[in-house]
Amino acid sequence: MTSIIKLHTISGAMDESPPCYILQIDDVRILLDCGWDEKFDANFIKELKRQVHTLDAVLLSHPDAYHLGALPYLVGKLGLNCPIYATIPVFKMGQMFMYDLYMSHFNMGDFDLFSLDDVDTAFEKITQLKYNQTVSLKDKGYGISITPLNAGHMIGGTIWKIVKVGEEDIVYATDFNHKKERHLSGCELDRLQRPSLLITDAYNAQYQQARRRARDEKLMTNILQTVRNNGNVLIAVDTAGRVLELAHMLDQLWKNKESGLMAYSLALLNNVSYNVIEFAKSQIEWMSDKLTKAFEGARNNPFQFKHIQLCHSLADVYKLPAGPKVVLASTPDLESGFTRDLFVQWASNANNSIILTTRTSPGTLAMELVENCAPGKQIELDVRRRVDLEGAELEEYLRTQGEKLNPLIVKPDVEEESSSESEDDIEMSVITGKHDIVVRPEGRHHSGFFKSNKRHHVMFPYHEEKVKCDEYGEIINLDDYRIADATGYEFVPMEEQNKENVKKEEPGIGAEQQANGGIVDNDVQLLEKPTKLISQRKTIEVNAQVQRIDFEGRSDGESMLKILSQLRPRRVIVIHGTAEGTQVVARHCEQNVGARVFTPQKGEIIDVTSEIHIYQVRLTEGLVSQLQFQKGKDAEVAWVDGRLGMRVKAIEAPMDVTVEQDASVQEGKTLTLETLADDEIPIHNSVLINELKLSDFKQTLMRNNINSEFSGGVLWCSNGTLALRRVDAGKVAMEGCLSEEYYKIRELLYEQYAIV
């Protein structure tokens, strides 16, 4: 491999932080995932902010926030503008993840890291691919192709194969699963034969999973014991990834009449549950062969649930039939979303059960419950929620919003409560605005010229308007139509309302989400539902049973090491794992695979070029203008004489950086080749470049009317007077008497080479 390969580990190295890496192939910089954790840690964003304008492509491997959570922020706030590639399910389900993430945090506070508009803008830039579809990068990435392969972890999950033309391949494989599940097939790593470079994770290197049968029995036993004890079950799941496996499993369990679970309610609760299931119905071809064959044979969609109720709010859960409930709710970390709300309500009841299905980052509520949660333990939580504005607060909000939307709107006069009918009250009750007849100015002392008909105005005030007309009829006042009613909605022409991109509101996506989420035309601006944030500190006594049952869908440590032994990569970069887990994978690759192993630290840039004596040198414009190129077989070549130098090149940074950020911008150094003076250029022997085949040269001689024939591996020309034969080291020897034909054949021979 002659390309210079580097990897910058921005996040996800020697720890379990979200994956975010920059892979550099010569001058092409590719961002591999851009995850964000539950706390929205901004430390790695500072480093990524300096690199965002140097990126040439982005590859997304999974749809959850742990792999693409920072994408809306990069596009909406940092101005990321390069091609983004993902599979179709990652595109669709990724939107659902980010919608639900935004709404979950917005309902708990003022969330301003990104908006739903940023989510839509980011996902509009994604190029959607299918498995095994090879796409060539453009512009600077010319010559590099990418291919997505099935990872088996989530629907649409991807192992990326990156290949540069004429060179070996690079495989980016993290969070893969080799086991077949109910709704997904296993990964396809066996199709990759000894990759040149493998970038893989050590997340499960020291983790041993329970067998699938034991895991499922543990879940079913917990549910049965809880509901029969008149308790509720809260299952913390993600939005649109691993939840599909659990939902399909539980719906099948509820169909079994012998289980007796049909008497209890089963619900899926998140902000976009309806859309998640609808997307799952349309993506059967991305799932396991078993589901695909069942769908093709019986025409029965496996995600047409008969027992799962789709809920989008706690109010929907309360409307379910009375009695024990099993609720699949987001998010799995219990830091936000409906899982936190239900935890606050159900944790104190000893009959209830809380099931955690995945490992989360240290410091989250879910991790705290798993590590140290004895029965009766008290936990202090900040409980924040939004409530609708009412009464005076609602009136004040509507008045303020109305003035912001249109400063021409004048506050309507409040109906007089007093029965006083003084002349001043009558004057103040006159409706202000534009009139075609003369009216008395308000707030100004008046003379007796205007006669006030007090009794008439008190009963039924009537103001005659003079209609203005021109050659085409009555003049239309556009303001009358722009302000349609008092609710603050703007008037939109009918042709704008009939645009194809306007759809009806779907369950699970509210008015604000439809407006900001790109489902409604941007010209239609709907007011947010007026709410306020209420925060209080609560002490929760955890009496409910807390269990963690693994439904992560990743390969265990033992299986992962066996897969690495089968792949036999030449070089391995181990990322995304604890220091101990990283060393376990590194030692296995060194001892059993025989590969060069790299274990970078967070923020480190490592050079994994296969040839250690390759350097990248930039030619100056003056030197390039003096080169004399000779045309070869597939390219043009030239001899270069120059002096090696060093130039400093600053890394491009955003224009809106602060003073501290600007000072932290590092400068990169690049090697250059400078022009030599004429008396400094050394003399060199001519070099002939080409791999000549005598059979091809025989055709050249025939085109020039020179007879030739092979005999004993020698090409005889001119009736056997000249001989051409190949000697060692790829040289061609020419023997014969000096003659006119000798020089003619030699000239034709020289033309087959690029001489520099």
UniProtKB/Swiss-Prot annotation:
Asked if the keyword Secreted belongs to this entry, the reply reads no
Q: Which residues carry this modification: Phosphothreonine?
A: T221, T226
Q: What is its main location?
A: nucleus
Give the GO biological process terms. co-transcriptional mRNA 3'-end processing, cleavage and polyadenylation pathway; mRNA 3'-end processing by stem-loop binding and cleavage
Origin: domain of life: Eukaryota
Record-given protein name = Probable cleavage and polyadenylation specificity factor subunit 2
Q: GO terms for CC?
A: mRNA cleavage and polyadenylation specificity factor complex
> Which GO-annotated molecular functions does the record name?
RNA binding
Localization (cell): Nucleus
- Describe the protein's quaternary organization and the partners it interacts with: Component of the cleavage and polyadenylation specificity factor (CPSF) complex, composed of at least Clp, Cpsf73, Cpsf100 and Cpsf160. Interacts with Sym and Cpsf73 forming a core cleavage factor required for both polyadenylated and histone mRNA processing. Interacts with Slbp and Lsm11.
The residues that cross the membrane are none
Give the similarity note: Belongs to the metallo-beta-lactamase superfamily. RNA-metabolizing metallo-beta-lactamase-like family. CPSF2/YSH1 subfamily.
What Gene3D superfamilies does its record include?
Ribonuclease Z/Hydroxyacylglutathione hydrolase-like (3.60.15.10)
One Pfam family name from the record?
A: Lactamase_B_6
Record PANTHER family: CLEAVAGE AND POLYADENYLATION SPECIFICITY FACTOR SUBUNIT 2 (PTHR45922:SF1)
- Record CDD domains: CPSF2-like_MBL-fold
Cystine bridges: none
Q: Which InterPro entries match?
A: Beta_Casp, CPSF2, Cpsf2_C, CPSF2_MBL, Metallo-B-lactamas, RibonucZ/Hydroxyglut_hydro, RMMBL
